[in-house]
C-alpha cells in the first residue's frame, strides 16, 4: 500500500476535531449514517426534471424511492441467468437498492433513467470504428444517428482515413481527408438534435503522425465548426521525446503506410497548446500508454475514447460506469472523522455486482456493440465526493497529504474491484475474451469477470443526486446566490462550510453573499485554517490539478475525468507546462479549461485575446452554422406589421436578425433588409445586442405608431424594440437560475435545457441548477 506522509501535527489534529464537532448532529451526519438519507432540495429537483418516470403530458409517475426500486428490480432480473431461485433475485434487489438508496453508489445516468423502462438503454457512450472507405464511413454516420437517437454519445478515431488530396484508386479522384468527414458526423448530430432528443456528444481523435494533423488541430479555432465534437490528438511518449529534443518526426499515410513528410514535433506541440489555450481544444491522449493497459490486445488496438475522454474503448465497446460516494465512506470516532475501509470494501463489491448485471440487462442500440460489450464485459467503478472527504478529514486539496490519500484510496478500490470481479468469475465464469487477455498470461493469471474494471468518470448529475462534490474535482464554489422572481436572494451554501461557519460563530447572511460574489475565501475575514481546508477549484494552481489527476491515474485501469482549470489571464506557456507535466507524471490524457475560452468570445467580448491575455481590437464575423434556432417577434409600425426573427447560436447569444413587413416591396422593405443585414453582421462580429439597441432605438420617421402602449418611431426603432425584448426575456429567465457567472468566468454560457449557468468540471459542461451534463 502507499504510505501516507506523516505531516499531521497538533494544529491539524485540532482542525480535524473542530470539523468533526461541527458535523455531529447535522444533516451531513444523519445522511452518512442513514439507510435512507434525506435528499437535498436540488437533488429532488434534478431527479424530477431528468430521471423520474412521466406520462405523455409530463406528469411525474414515480418518486425517487420508486426509481431506486425500479432500477434494482430490473437489474436483479439478470440473476436468473446464473441462479433462477427467487431468493437469489430478492437478495440482489435488496443489495442494489440499499447501496443506491444510501447514496453510497450510483450507476451512470442512463441506467437510472432507463432501467425497467421500454428503452432499456443503460450505457452512455460507445466507440465506433471509421474505416477508409466511403461505404464504411457513411455506415458509421448511420450508426451514429441511431446511437444519438437513443441518447448515447460516440467516440471515433479518424486516423485510418487517407489524407486530403490522396488518390482514390477506385475512382481516380482525390480524398477529402479526415476533417471533411468529421463534418459529416457533426452534421448528422445536428440533424438528430433537431429531431427533439438531447444533443449527442462526440469525441474525434487523430494520431499525431497523420498527414492532416495540423488541419485537425486548428479545425475548431473559429468557434463555428465541429460544435458537437470534443477533439483530441493521440500522441506517444516517442513524440514527446522529440518535442523535448526539438526534433522532426515522420508523418505516415495510413492508407498504405508510406512516408508522407515530416513536421517539427515542438512546433506541432506548441500549436496544440496554443489552440487549447484559445478554445479548450484539442486535448491530448497518450495512446501508447492507453494500449499498454489494453486488457484485450488480441481483439485489436484501442484508437479512441468516449466523448469525455476517461474511457478508452475498443471499436464497438460501450461505457458501463458508476461511482462510489467517498463522502459516505467515513465514520465518526470519539475525536475525528476517519475513513471506513470496511464500508468502502462492501460498497465496491455491490458496485461490481450491479454493473456486471447491467451488461446482461442492457438493450444495446447496435448488435455489434452488444456482441463486443458481452465479450469483454468492461465496467468502470469510479468515485465522487473526494473533495468532501478531504474537508471531513481536514486536508488541504493542494497538498502532498491529499495526493497520497488519493493514491491510497484508489489502490484500495482497484484491489477490491479486482477481488470482487474475481469472485463473480468463480460463480458466473470469466468474460469470454479472458483466455487471451492480459489476465491470463504466464506469471499473471487472475480470473476476472470484467475487463479493466476501474474508471474515474464524470459524475455531473449523479453527484448532484448524491449531494456530494463531483468526481475527484475540488469544490467549485462554497456559496451560490439564487435569485427568485420577486428579486429576493436565496443563499445556497456548501453544507460542510455552513456547518463549520455556524459552529465556529462566523456565519452570516452577509458573509455568504460576499462569498457567492467573490467565489473564494482568499481575501475574506475567516480563520486561516478555514481558507486552507475549503479551497475551491480556482484557488488551486494548474500544477496541483495535474498532480491530483496523476495520483488517481496510478491505480485506475482506464483514465481519469478531470478539468485542469486556468484563470482567464493564463498564458499559452502555462497550458504548455500543464500538458508537459501530465506527460511527466504518467497521465493518459489531459483536458484544460481557461476561464472564458469556451464562452464564444468572438460573440461576447468583441474581440480575440492575445497570448498575453490582452484583447485585440480586430473584429471578424463568425461563420454561420448550418442550423440555428430562433423566435419571431411581431411589432406594429406605421408601415404595417413587422415580423423580426432573431436566431441564436447554441449558447443562446443573438446571432442574426431577419425582418419582414406585412406589405412587401418598396423602399420600406429595402431599408428593413439593409438594417437586418447590418445588425446580423454586427452580432456575428462580436458587438453586443445592447450596444446595437442603443444605436437604433429612438430613430424617428414620419409614420410613428403605438404597439401595446409603446411608441414605435420607425423601422429601425422597431428592430431595436424586438431585439431589446428578446434580450430582456432571456435575462428574466436567467433570474431563476444560479448566478455563477461572476464566479467561474464562463461569460454566462447558458444551460441548453434551463438557461442556468454552466460550469466546466470533470472535462464537461454541467448545470448546477437543473443537473444537465454534456457527459451524462
Where are these regions (language model features)?
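Acidic/polar, glycine-rich intrinsically disordered N-terminal extensions of enzymes
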Residues: 1-122, 128, 269-278, 580, ...
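Conserved phosphate/anionic-ligand binding catalytic regions in large, soluble enzymes, centered on
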Residues: 112-122, 127, 133-157, 205-207, ...
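Extended active-site and interfacial segments that coordinate phosphate-rich ligands
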Residues: 138-147, 162, 173-186, 219-233, ...
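Internal maturation/activation junctions in enzymes
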Residues: 141, 347-370, 374, 378, ...
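Catalytic alpha/beta core of large soluble enzyme barrels
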Residues: 310-312, 355-360, 430, 443-446, ...
